[in-house]
Amino acid sequence: MRRVIAQGTFDILHPGHVHYLSDAASLGDELHVIIARGENVTHKPKPILDGRQRRDMVAALDVVDEAHLGHVEDIFVPIEEIDPDVIVLGYDQHHDEDGIKAALDARGIDCEVTRATPRELRHDDELLSTGRIIDRIVERRC
């Protein structure tokens, strides 16, 4: 059984998230998704929804076998527990593949690290980013 991990914030689910997770699921038999805890999100604004809500939404997607909240102090703990064959990064996630691979190697975790493919726009006004969705909400509702 080939075990795959995808990870992210997943605040306000959108078609880009669904594509990422579907792409990741296609690379194995079992997809585990690690949901970043709000306190660990440092590269962009903190999530609007709490971790449990984001985890439950991701878990409801058919392609996801299990959704996990990330560890409060050490983002690699869930990876060690799941013991994946491959970690799939989002095509535009800020993580450095080589840096992740080096950190995994240092912990004795032997798995492939790859990137998901980008999702092509299907409509001119399609939004594939939580930030752009929030901008549109502010523009139209405030």
From Swiss-Prot:
The keyword Ribonucleoprotein does not apply. Pathway: Cofactor biosynthesis; FAD biosynthesis; FAD from FMN: step 1/1. It comes from the Archaea. Transmembrane segments: none annotated. InterPro entries: Archaeal_FAD_synthase, Cyt_trans-like, FAD_synth_RibL, Rossmann-like_a/b/a_fold. SUPFAM superfamilies: Nucleotidylyl transferase. Keywords: ATP-binding, FAD, Flavoprotein, FMN, Nucleotide-binding, Nucleotidyltransferase, Transferase. Its cofactor is a divalent metal cation. Belongs to the archaeal FAD synthase family. PANTHER family: FAD SYNTHASE. This is FAD synthase. It comes from Haloferax volcanii (strain ATCC 29605 / DSM 3757 / JCM 8879 / NBRC 14742 / NCIMB 2012 / VKM B-1768 / DS2) (Halobacterium volcanii).
